[in-house]
Amino acid sequence: MYQFLEQTVAGHMTRTVKTVTRGLTMRDLGDMFERDDFNAYPVEDDRQIVGLVTKFDLLKCFAFTPNQMVPRYDDLMRRTVADVMTPEFIYVRSDTKLTRVLQLMVEHRFRSVPVIDSGHRLEGMIAREDILRALKACIGRSAG
């Protein structure tokens, strides 16, 4: 188990990550969420990550108070990622300890966290499943 304390994101993150652009429509974003089993996509502009868009952001488009006029579905689906993305988001670096990532995931209920380099370019994503695999491997080594 002590081995887990020394593990960093670099050895466990997914390096090939799908990204979206600010101009992507909600319709296309919805199709991507349906097709891919992801909860979030990094938003990329000129090779830099400028935000994060989640399934929750997409769902928020459909939340209305009783006093609001309900917009037409087609109008909602023409909105873009730029309209709903989170421009200030939590990310980690590849040298971040997995224990810190686990802490962030539990505290904020994240399923995944972007891994960004010093130039704000995407290096990968670290997901709950990656953390669980690392834990399982460390526990297996210490038991064996």
Q: Where in the sequence are the language-model features?
A:
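The conserved cystathionine-beta-synthase
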Residues: 20-37, 43-44, 91-109, 116, ...
